[in-house]
Amino acid sequence: HRDYEIVLEGGSSSWGKVKARAKVNVPPASPLLPADCNVKLNVKPLDPAKGFVRISAVFESIVDSTKNKLTIEADIANETKERRISVGEGMVSVGGFSHSFSFEGSVVNMFYYRSDAVRRNVPNPIYRQGRQFHDILMKVPLDNNDLIDTWEGTVRAIGSTGTFNDWIRDFWFIGPAFTALNEGGQRISRIEVNGLNTESGPKGPVGVSRWRFSHGGSGMVDSISRWAELFPFDKLNRPAQVEAGFRSDSQGIEVKVDGEFPGVSVDAGGGLRRILNHPLIPLVHHGMVGKFNNFNVDAQLKVVLPKGYKVRYAAPQYRSQNLEEYRWSGGAYARWVEHVCKGGVGQFEVLYAQ
């Protein structure tokens, strides 16, 4: 069952509040491992003209009764048009162990292919990462004995666990890579782990892992870029924040998200504004796991427009209206939700004006 709510600000403001409550009755990615995870993220403008922001984040998780926490505060600014620089510090704790660290680095903005439906929503996006995680080749230098032992232990454990491949083969990853693979003309097949092995390099052994994904691949990258769309730096004239909680157990996954974002709507020309996307989309695009055909969704959406505004066009069509409050449920909306959950691009087109 899912409830979503979007409350929009008036005038030409792109800001809005987003609330999502979802209970997904599918086995989580780690079927036997109950997990709790809480995320708090604050983004504060320091000099919007230079894209200069301060990000504070706290990630807490409890997995198998062990509490893990990661705290980060970082200042990020544009160094050049192509490069952003980041300086920050943080602390990681696992159970009774904690470790403080600081970091400094730069990132080059990279671009990856997006479908026309997404491109229509976002005129000038900056994308992160490659197009999709398909046939990843990951090299990790193993430069001390502890790392080598850990790596070899992992390889042995995976190689000797009969159930590992069984449960992975038995589930479909439901996410946007379904579409990405179709667009790329690739056949959709089940997940295969091609192999994990160790090869020698000039400075000692190098861990190499080659994975082939079917449709779980691009979920996380796509999700991150979708969340990033909600944080356009040029509209960040006050602090933005998001608080989220994820609970998973053998019954499924429960999600709670509350956020105030600067990029909930965009100017669509002619006095119209477009709601950028449905809260379902970034959640689903983490790549959900479930039996592909056995998937039904009970979802509803509430959109609250600024006073005096009206919806001028809606696809899927809304079910009811009371002044500035519009509600979607069942019918075309339910079919649209199921389409998105099964990896469809799922264009969500809601235009509003005074």
UniProtKB/Swiss-Prot annotation:
Bacteriochlorophyll a 4 binds at H278. Bacteriochlorophyll a 1 binds at H99. GO terms for molecular function: bacteriochlorophyll binding; metal ion binding. One of its GO terms (biological process) is photosynthesis. Bacteriochlorophyll a 6 binds at H134. Keywords: Bacteriochlorophyll, Chlorophyll, Chromophore, Electron transport, Magnesium, Metal-binding, Photosynthesis, Reaction center, Transport. Bacteriochlorophyll a 3 binds at H286. Pfam families: BChl_A. Bacteriochlorophyll a 7 binds at H285. Intermediary in the transfer of excitation energy from the chlorophyll to the reaction centers. Homotrimer. Each subunit contains 7 molecules of bacteriochlorophyll a. This is Bacteriochlorophyll a protein. The gene is fmoA.
